[in-house]
Design a protein with these regions (language model features):
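Conserved, well-structured functional cores that handle cations and Mg-NTP chemistry
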Residues: 3-6, 10-212
Length: 212
């Protein structure tokens, strides 16, 4: 998926059906590290739901747009299911490397995702460079591989404001582990860079960071 200025690009069910074969092959490759067949199945259903039109991306909202199976199984996949996320991101980064074989730069950014509620992990009234203002949103730190054609993400780290790491009454019910401590954007960026460098990807000549 080429980064186009937004977190996700939505498509209709009809458009999705036209590229189903390519999408299914892509999802199968990306979800292979999940191992168990059932886990890969619900991962595929979840990704398809995220690509459909609709502002709300909760499990319940996805169930309304893509009724396949039951909501409890979807919730199990995105919440307590104990699967390792790093092999998936490494597989994605390696695929991005193949798509952008001659990178000009790695670009660090902090995209924001506007939210209307207050229960999504990390949501707070905070500044978003994507929105260009302070708003109720989630903010992530992201690393992108870029060339003359465009860019695509190598990884993300969700930024958690202090109210999410220091208030157990808020972070606990949302599944934030007790051992997670507050980390500013810069520290998240360094951790993301170290992780990506550990995957032995080709290093670009330039590294850039968004200063907005």
């Amino acid at each position: 998926m080429v980064w186009g200025g937004g977190i996700f690009q939505s498509v209709t069910e009809k458009q999705l059906s036209r590229c189903r074969q390519r999408l299914e092959a892509f999802i199968a490759e990306m979800l292979a590290p999940l191992g168990r067949r059932e886990r890969r199945h619900w991962g595929r259903v979840y990704v398809r739901g995220l690509l459909l039109n609709g502002e709300r991306k909760s499990v319940g909202a996805l169930a309304e747009r893509l009724p396949e199976g039951n909501e409890q199984n979807r919730q199990q996949f995105v919440s307590p299911s104990p699967w390792a996320w790093e092999p998936l991101w490494q597989g994605m980064a390696e695929r991005v490397e193949r798509a952008f074989p001659n990178p000009v730069a790695w670009i660090m950014d902090d995209p924001g995702l506007p939210k209307t509620g207050e229960h999504s992990v990390g949501v707070a009234r905070q500044y978003s460079g994507t929105l260009g203002k302070t708003a109720n949103c989630q903010v992530a730190v992201s690393l992108h591989r870029s060339d003359a054609r465009g860019s695509s993400p190598l990884g993300f780290r969700l930024y958690l404001p202090k109210e999410w790491t220091e208030d157990a009454a808020r972070g606990g019910p949302a599944g934030v582990p007790e051992e997670v401590a507050f980390q500013p954007h810069g520290r998240l960026a360094l951790a993301l860079s170290d992780q990506t460098l550990g995957w032995a990807l080709e290093k670009p000549p330039v590294g850039l960071a968004d200063s907005a």
